[in-house]
């Protein structure tokens, strides 16, 4: 039996994707639409207060293409807090005009593939804590996609030795380091939580960097032989004070 990688786990993560039912929203009176937006703004401004206490974070993006219109990403210390947020969001009047298109449940994760030997408690290391309990960068653009490590008769990631996986992940990580300062990456583990094994969330002020890093990593052995991917979502940041314009119908 191959040795399983150990993980450090941080905040729980919930990506929620919605399409706006513009046809139904268009039929609502303007004063009702204004009230819907005000209620939504108030809700999201309230959930964002966790930033000041460093007990979570969130990000809101306008997704490009027909897979979704909105992405709401929430990070919290407990899974049940994500349940509460989702339930309360579904009770908002705007929810009657939003169609869920996708969601992803996971937890911020760091593996021990590239970790050095140390006797210290990793959860007390400031650098590790900043990655497990992050302050999101709120860059102009976001990219999210789920992924698996392939396991079939020809290529099975889970049958490789720890040493083989460490070597592959080292080479994989060296490509990522080339994009330091251009892309901020968050890996969330989802084995037992969702249909894929990991979620990858990328932030950048230059949307083209997403294409560059994903394409370059296609030639990396870790990805070429063992990577399997779900749908990609990309979008531009939207602030709550921009909702009036976003939901405006002339």
From Swiss-Prot:
The active site is at residue 145. GO terms for biological process: heme B biosynthetic process. One of its GO terms (molecular function) is oxidoreductase activity, acting on the CH-CH group of donors, oxygen as acceptor. Fe-coproporphyrin III binds at residues 131, 145-149, 172, 185. Its EC number is 1.3.98.5. It comes from Staphylococcus aureus (strain bovine RF122 / ET3-1). Fe-coproporphyrin III acts both as a substrate and a redox cofactor. NCBIfam families: PRK12276.1. It catalyses: Fe-coproporphyrin III + 2 H2O2 + 2 H(+) = heme b + 2 CO2 + 4 H2O; Fe-coproporphyrin III + H2O2 + H(+) = harderoheme III + CO2 + 2 H2O; harderoheme III + H2O2 + H(+) = heme b + CO2 + 2 H2O. Involved in coproporphyrin-dependent heme b biosynthesis. Catalyzes the decarboxylation of Fe-coproporphyrin III (coproheme) to heme b (protoheme IX), the last step of the pathway. The reaction occurs in a stepwise manner with a three-propionate intermediate. This is Coproheme decarboxylase. Gene3D superfamilies: Apc35880, domain 1.
């Amino acid at each position: 039996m191959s040795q399983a990688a150990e993980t450090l786990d941080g905040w729980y993560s919930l990506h929620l994707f919605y399409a706006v039912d513009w046809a139904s929203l268009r039929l609502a009176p303007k004063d009702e639409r204004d009230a819907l937006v005000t209620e939504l703004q108030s809700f999201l401004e309230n959930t964002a207060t966790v930033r000041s206490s460093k007990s979570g974070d969130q990000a809101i993006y306008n997704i490009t293409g027909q897979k979704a219109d909105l992405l709401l990403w929430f990070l919290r210390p407990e899974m049940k807090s994500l349940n509460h947020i989702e339930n309360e969001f579904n009770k908002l009047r705007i929810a009657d005009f939003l169609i869920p298109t996708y969601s992803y449940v996971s937890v911020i994760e760091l593996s021990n593939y590239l970790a050095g030997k140390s006797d210290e408690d990793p959860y007390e290391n400031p650098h590790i804590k900043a990655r497990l309990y992050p302050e999101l960068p709120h860059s102009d653009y976001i990219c999210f996609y789920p992924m698996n490590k392939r396991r079939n008769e020809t290529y099975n990631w889970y049958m490789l030795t720890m040493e083989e996986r460490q070597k592959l992940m080292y080479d994989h990580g060296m490509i990522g380091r080339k994009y330091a300062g251009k892309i901020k990456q968050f890996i969330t583990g989802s084995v037992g939580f969702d249909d894929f094994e990991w979620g990858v969330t990328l932030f950048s002020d230059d949307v083209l960097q997403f294409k560059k890093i994903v394409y370059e990593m296609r030639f990396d052995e870790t990805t070429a032989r063992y990577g399997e991917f779900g749908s990609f979502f990309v979008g531009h940041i939207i602030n709550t004070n921009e909702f009036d314009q976003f939901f405006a119908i002339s």
